[in-house]
UniProtKB/Swiss-Prot annotation:
It comes from Rattus norvegicus (Rat). Half-transporter that form a functional transporter via homo- or heterodimerization. Homodimer. Heterodimers with ABCG1. It is found in: Cell membrane; Cytoplasmic vesicle membrane; Endosome membrane. SMART domains: AAA (SM00382). The chain crosses the membrane at residues 394-414, 424-444, 477-497, 508-528, 537-557, 622-642. This is ATP-binding cassette subfamily G member 4. Its EC number is 7.6.2.-. Its main location: membrane. SUPFAM superfamilies: P-loop containing nucleoside triphosphate hydrolases. PANTHER family: ABC TRANSPORTER G FAMILY MEMBER 28, ATP-BINDING CASSETTE SUB-FAMILY G MEMBER 4. It is a multi-pass membrane protein.
Amino acid sequence: MAEKALEAVGCGLGPGAVAMAVALEDGAEPPVLTTHLKKVENHITEAQRFSHLPKRSAVDIEFVELSYSVREGPCWRKRGYKTLLKCLSGKFCRRELIGIMGPSGAGKSTFMNILAGYRESGMKGQILVNGRPRDLRTFRKMSCYIMQDDMLLPHLTVLEAMMVSANLKLSEKQEVKKELVTEILTALGLMSCSHTRTALLSGGQRKRLAIALELVNNPPVMFFDEPTSGLDSASCFQVVSLMKSLAHGGRTVICTIHQPSAKLFEMFDKLYILSQGQCIFKGVVTNLIPYLKGLGLHCPTYHNPADFIIEVASGEYGDLNPMLFRAVQNGLCTMAEKKSSPEKNEVPAHCPTCPPELDPIESHTFATSTLTQFCILFRRTFLSILRDTVLTHLRFMSHVLIGVLIGLLYLHIGDDASKVFNNTGFLFFSMLFLMFAALMPTVLTCELICLAKMAVFMREHLNYWYSLKAYYLAKTMADVPFQVVCPVVYCSIVYWMTGQPAETSRFLLFSALSIATALVAQSLGLLIGAASTSLQVATFVGPVTAIPVLLFSGFFVSFKTIPTYLQWSSYLSYVRYGFEGLILTIYGMERGHLTCLEDHCPFRDPQIILHELDVEEAKLYMDFLVLGIFFLALRLLAYLVLRYRVKSER
């Protein structure tokens, strides 16, 4: 015995291993080994944690003969339609965690998008909510969709993001909202990182935050698209446990999941398995293996049932899908479930046929007014811009550095009659720089081009956080202060360094025209970004649209020398009105003669300069008026394009 102990010690084993070796040598029972590891009870799955949420009526969803088709190819080529979903029927009840499974391309996400109301055109069949035909607007107010990619605004903290959600979704007092947010964060294990920016969260924390944002108003129906995608096993278990607790709290929770582990698979209450757009199984999880066995498909021992059904659907055991389709259509799934659970032949108590009355919140479009939504979104967007230090600092420093460079290049030429054309070149370049400085950043950071921001907007808007007009106004107006400050900084540098007239009125007009031109360019950037389908398209279209705008600005070619059939193009150039206004500001308004340091100065009289540049009949107020019209028209057009894009997503 001593030799065995010494041998165990010699092998580097610890005291516990030595004791076990000795006990085994004596033929005794091995001692129970205790370690420092202890399994901690996961309280995040307790439904009681969510009892504080606002009370909402439970919802059951039923779908009958549901089909979905899309047009193949472009609309101008009539190639027919492709059917993605075929004759799907079933019922998803409250207090159940339903998993939609299937191989890649089976139609899982399409199916859930239709159930959530994100897809309408091309759908056939009927969807019932609590036994009544679904009213899409009402249904979207009582449901939420948590997408696969947890796109969050990176510059907000967890607490700030939650308060934005609470302020938009609830009409209670601020103290009640704060208490509710604190309780949700505590229940989901996010309180410790409440002051951490969302960009620094882990994958599991981001997923839980995405759920927390939608839990604020306690939606009775929750859709999850691949909630475990990209997470480790521990985070996957936490997320699925959380979904199960939400379901057992009275909600209808539906999620797509690709290939869960056996541990996660057993946590689902019911399954709806798709293959090639058709259902191959629907029912409780425990019925899957007996059901397949009855069809002659035996799952190997110790094999994950989720893996087995995916292998069957993928054709690894032959083309068995037609047989599975017929079995479901003939009602074998329903009969198998009744056979295994005779007590379930009657309708469960938690899946009533009489629809309950909807909550008062469902009778309103949004929980808050458009003005309140605008104020909340404006503050959030403005805060995000301020915290985006890279972009904000680059914008500010570029105006300062370019301003100093231009000031040094055109130093003290503003009152020199022999350098009039150099001065007009300075005025035109100022318009050129301010145009591109406002146009391109807007194009490249537009919501519909930046996928992250687009996903955030689509999730929040389609989950009925706010209206499209409130979001658009807040988004566009939040950037206006920066489009005012940057041109003013640039003008304050170049105006005095280049020696322009030392009059306050002229400087203010110079700055106002610069700001107006920058705002119009920003509006054009919004339109280009909203209309472009990709970043590459927007990057190409932005500079291309600037070419005719600059060409017909009046600097390269005067209006009189433009061919008659092209003169109309000059009226569409907003740079023309900005440049024309600057010429009138610097050389108009009854300015006195310029300083002449040479023997002959043909442009000493400012009126001659105005005549030469073909602006002597122009009116300064008209330039401001036309720039204002451009600003409003482009903003309105960008809004209409955004609205069209949002509708086309459905």
